[in-house]
Amino acid sequence: MGPSAPLLLFFLLSWPGSLQGQQHHLVEYMERRLAALEERLAQCQDQSSRHAAELRDFKNKMLPLLEVAEKERETLRTEADSISGRVDRLEREVDYLETQNPALPCVELDEKVTGGPGTKGKGRRNEKYDMVTDCSYTISQVRSMKILKRFGGSAGLWTKDPLGPAEKIYVLDGTQNDTAFVFPRLRDFTLTMAARKASRIRVPFPWVGTGQLVYGGFLYYARRPPGGAGGGGELENTLQLIKFHLANRTVVDSSVFPAERLIPPYGLTVDTYIDLAADEEGLWAVYATREDDRHLCLAKLDPQTLDTEQQWDTPCPRENAEAAFVICGTLYVVYNTRPASRARIQCSFDASGTLTPERAALSYFPRRYGAHASLRYNPRERQLYAWDDGYQIVYKLEMKKKEEEV
């Protein structure tokens, strides 16, 4: 053996003892870790037990409170149902009283109503209108209403074309705007994001008020002529009628409305100066002038040329009027109060003379307390399309035959 043999022998003899020492330390380390884990698990179990006990206590405390809240909710629901029933009964009683004791129609005799033809403006004035159709209906009552949605601002107009596609909806938001929304169907208009489904039509001149009309594929509206809004001179109180082709998106005709010193016809809708309307007979315009600032005027227009064919001074007051529409040649004026209350048709004027104002029925709008910014009659559907503080509403009308004047 060499000199290193004893050292190697010593190393081999001492090696098993070193391994045994390492294993012993490892076992002790594992035991300490397991003991720590067991202690933590015990703490978690204690905390879980404590939380479970707290939850049980909280549940036991809340159950009686929930029972009391449920009883109070049932009591409130019963009271609400009772109040709703009482309100319904009161409304029926009010409707009955209004039917039994109607307010007198707004009729004021005036020399201009019964006098001869006027000398101002185009067309004949205050002459009996000769009906071009056999339409002989008048409103019996505003039967029902349906609120479609809320779209746009407090003032605007929504309508259909009575001579165009039956489903297409036109929406003109605001009293001074130049963009109209067109919806292919009513269902598209009622969607939450309706504006994304609409096509937009921009007119070359902004409209004034909410007196626009869609009729026969054209948009008829009033605008201030150049220099008309505060410009002085003859154009100070005049308006220009525009006939806009919706398909071609071009102005096909325009005409200065033949009435001087125009004022808003409706005392409660001060942004509208000319309110255009369509019925079974054609195109009409409702307006007022300073010459008689107490009453409304009515004009029959030629939809082709925008010429004024006839004009009438009506007995319907401007005060508290908010909107109007025409059915079978008869103007119906809607009145309200400020603050807004229940709207009512309280004055009518039949251009043909068949229906006298005294015989016209006073009709209240059903269960709606608001202010109409516009009303559009659709002769094809016999419905009114209303704009009430941004809400779009449809009113169904019940008709009856006109009584012949004796």
Swiss-Prot record:
Heme as UniProt keyword: no
A GO cellular component annotated for this chain's UniProt record is: extracellular space
Query: Which key words are in the record?
Result: Coiled coil, Developmental protein, Disulfide bond, Glycoprotein, Secreted, Signal
Q: Name one GO biological process term.
A: signal transduction
Name which cysteines form disulfide bonds: 135-328
**Which residues are tagged as glycosylated in the record?**
248
Q: Where is the Olfactomedin-like domain?
A: 134-401
Q: Where does the record place it?
A: Secreted
Signal peptide as annotated in the record: 1-21
The coiled-coil segments of this chain are 22-101
The protein in question is named Olfactomedin-like protein 3
Q: From which source organism is this entry? A: Rattus norvegicus
